[in-house]
Regions:
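HIT superfamily nucleotide-processing domains
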Residues: 1-161
């Protein structure tokens, strides 16, 4: 069970009116933990590239899921896994959200929805909690660009000592 966390809205976040902002760690953490994830977005220059990529990929593969499964997400067959936990693939986001330098934006892909406990286990296995801090979320269905392949957005940064 996750500990109770008190969060305060960063002052700079409240004052922003432009869409080309770069989100700080405090911004990302606040928006994720307060369930305002729709406010986190790509930089406009990345969004333009993403939209062109989506159009081209849909023309070539029919769906984004087809593209991902044929080029990036090579899940083991059910007969090759002995674990009860579903296999996952961790990849950097090719079109990351607009976050400041030092924040990684990765995706945890699966063939089945993942529980929060399992997501935490995956992250802790790959990123030592003493060295890293993170927040994660699943986009609501209305803004998911890949609806048929469950995936979790994770933002990480090295802990500041």
């Amino acid at each position: 069970m996750a500990p109770s966390i008190s969060i305060e809205q960063p002052i700079a976040l409240d004052a922003r009116i432009y869409k080309d902002e770069v989100f700080s760690w405090e911004d990302v953490r606040y928006l994720v933990l307060s369930n305002q994830i729709k406010k986190i977005h790509r930089h406009p220059s990345v969004q333009v590239v993403y939209q062109k990529w989506m159009k081209d990929t849909l023309e070539k593969y029919g769906t984004i899921e087809n593209y991902l499964l044929s080029t990036k997400l090579h899940f083991p067959s059910a007969t090759n896994t002995s674990s009860e936990e579903p296999p996952v693939i961790i990849l950097p986001n090719d079109f990351p959200y607009s976050v400041e330098k030092g924040i990684k934006h990765i995706l945890i892909w699966s063939q089945t929805p993942l529980t929060p406990d399992y997501v935490e286990k995956i992250i802790q296995k790959n990123y030592t909690p003493k060295e890293w801090e993170w927040v994660y979320f699943v986009n609501p269905p209305e803004v998911q660009s890949v609806k048929k392949l469950p995936h979790v957005h994770v933002f990480l940064r090295r802990r500041l000592f």
